[in-house]
């Protein structure tokens, strides 16, 4: 007899918060490992297009507002906390929608991973450095990756929903 996965009841936050917690755990452990292993700015080439490098981001994605006077730390922390509240509300309300909830759980875990950095260190720790020759994509971390994957899944879920409504 084949087992089927039951859908979490609407209002069941535990499975989705569990996913977020796993993201936070891997994100924070990876950052601790980089902090213990690398000096600031030190690079270690793993392939011809990928390095590990320890950098600090005081701004947002792509270093946006990283040179501001310091207010951005608290603004982005508040934004992350606000996003957490909205996402928890949405998860409580739509927990039965699997893909939607997984995408939100990934975004939540990533957002909280970066909020933790801002509160503990005053900046976000980035270390994944993809490059093509001398051109480097801005360094990022596992929390950023979870946010990106969650956003892509959210867009896919919405496109699927809209197409299904036709």
Curated annotation (Swiss-Prot):
Pathway involvement of the protein, from the record: Protein modification; lipoprotein biosynthesis (signal peptide cleavage)
Keywords linked to the UniProt accession: Aspartyl protease, Cell inner membrane, Cell membrane, Hydrolase, Membrane, Protease, Transmembrane, Transmembrane helix
Membership in a protein family: Belongs to the peptidase A8 family.
Protein name: Lipoprotein signal peptidase
An example molecular function term from Gene Ontology annotations: aspartic-type endopeptidase activity
Membrane topology type: Multi-pass membrane protein
GO CC terms, sorted: plasma membrane
GO biological process terms on file: proteolysis
Reaction catalysis annotation: Release of signal peptides from bacterial membrane prolipoproteins. Hydrolyzes -Xaa-Yaa-Zaa-|-(S,diacylglyceryl)Cys-, in which Xaa is hydrophobic (preferably Leu), and Yaa (Ala or Ser) and Zaa (Gly or Ala) have small, neutral side chains
InterPro entries found in the cross-reference section: Peptidase_A8
Keyword set includes Transit peptide: no
HAMAP family the record matches: LspA
Enzyme class, first EC level, given as a word: hydrolase
Active site: 126, 144
Highest taxon in the source lineage: Bacteria
Transmembrane segments: 9-29, 45-65, 71-91, 100-120, 135-155
Enzyme Commission number: 3.4.23.36
Function: This protein specifically catalyzes the removal of signal peptides from prolipoproteins.
Subcellular locations according to the entry: Cell inner membrane
